[in-house]
Every structure is written in structure tokens, then in C-alpha cells.
Amino acid sequence: MRFDVVTLFPDFFTSPLASGLLGKALAKQIAEVYLLNPRDFTTDKHHRVDDESYGGGVGMVLKPEPIFAAVESLPVLPRREVILMSPQGERLDQALLQSLADNFDQLVVICGHYEGVDERVVDHLVTREISLGDFVLTCGEIPALTLLNGVIRLLPGTVGKAESLQNESFIDGLLDFPHYTRPADFRGWPVPQVLRSGHHAEVDRWRRTQQIQRTRDRRPDLYQRWLNSLPPDSLQDFTV
């Protein structure tokens, strides 16, 4: 899968893309990441990428010309999405990450800055806006890296054991169950006996119960959404 990131700070991505699972995925050519700096696509001697906002106001706006030029310099794969990381976008969640991983061969990711980008970029270049949540960050590189990380780890071959992806938070609409490792007793806090019992059916039942309880207690919004997704005749099977 190909990722093209339009960013004023390409060095921001150097270490994360060389480390951990992302680094391994790139080394195995599961994913390709290309970084484009809009300054390299300017035509003035100062390499200016921003200007004042029409109508006045505080803050600068990213100019359309360098962004269009950067994106238009790229090859176009058959299944391509041009994404702007923006507080105005749809909320990023696991389902959206999975959809991007499954349905596209190329993601062009534009990192916003300052007061944002010229609206003509949104209207005539971007095909989707994505937000991490209802808050504002200093730059678009942080959400862009989050998007890359979330999508790349879903690509076949990135995570060693495919089943690891099937037991994570949000895969089935619920939070993950608690995890424990050795020692069996730490400072008087023992690992639940059921996890040491060797009874796989009991372990699965315990984990499912923990998922439901944890989601209900910590994320009632997710819990209600999960309940609403269940067939009415199955609700009695999930009372905890």
C-alpha cells in the first residue's frame, strides 16, 4: 500500500517510520511511505506556503498552489483517497482504519497547519477529511502519523500473528479484556485463577465478560452502540 504525506515537517516522520512494526512493514515493502514538502513546490524565491486570511483575522492559512502542485505530482493508483487531517473531519475509529486498509491502494495525507488550508483544497482536491477528535493540535503531522500507524498495522504481514488483530479493543465494538503475565503473584495481587486453569472455554467466557463489563463501565457510549448492534433475542446472553 502506498502512502504519500504532504507535510511541512518531513523530519517529524523519520524516527517513527524507522522503528517497530512500521519500520518492519516498510522494510518488507508491505507499505511505502513518501514525504512531500509543499515548500519544494513553490515558485517564489522565499518558498512561501502560507498567507493572510481573506476577510481578516488572526493566523495564517496554507496556500492552495503548493498543495495542489505536490499532490498533482504524484502517480494516481486506481483506488486512491486524498485525506486532509482536520478537526472538521469524520472521527477516526477502528472501523474507519479497517475500511481504509481494505479499500484503498494509495492514501495521500495532507497535514494541516496554522488556521488550516485554503478551502479550495478541501473543495477541489481532498476526497475525505479525518479528525482524531474534538480537540486542536499544533500540527497535522501527529494525526497523520496516527493514521499511518493504524492503517499499516492492519495490512497483511505487518503483525506477526493475524489472530492478534482479532482480539483487540474495538474490533467487535468492545474494549479489550485485561491481560496478565508472570509472575502469577505480584505484591499480593494474583492473576485471576481462571486464567491459570487451562480451561479454554472458561478463559474465553471470563474474557468476554470482562470486555462487556469494562466497556459498560469505561465507555458507556461504546457499550450502548454495541448493545444496539445486537439482535434483540440475544441481549439476555450478554447481561453481566
From Swiss-Prot:
A GO CC term attached to the entry: cytosol
Enzyme class: transferase
Positions bound to S-adenosyl-L-methionine: G112, L132, G133, D134, F135, V136, L137
Keyword S-adenosyl-L-methionine assigned: yes
CDD domains in UniProt: TrmD-like
Localization per record: Cytoplasm
Family: Belongs to the RNA methyltransferase TrmD family.
HAMAP family in the record: TrmD
Protein name, as recorded: tRNA (guanine-N(1)-)-methyltransferase
Native organism: Cyanothece sp. (strain PCC 7425 / ATCC 29141)
Name of the coding gene: trmD
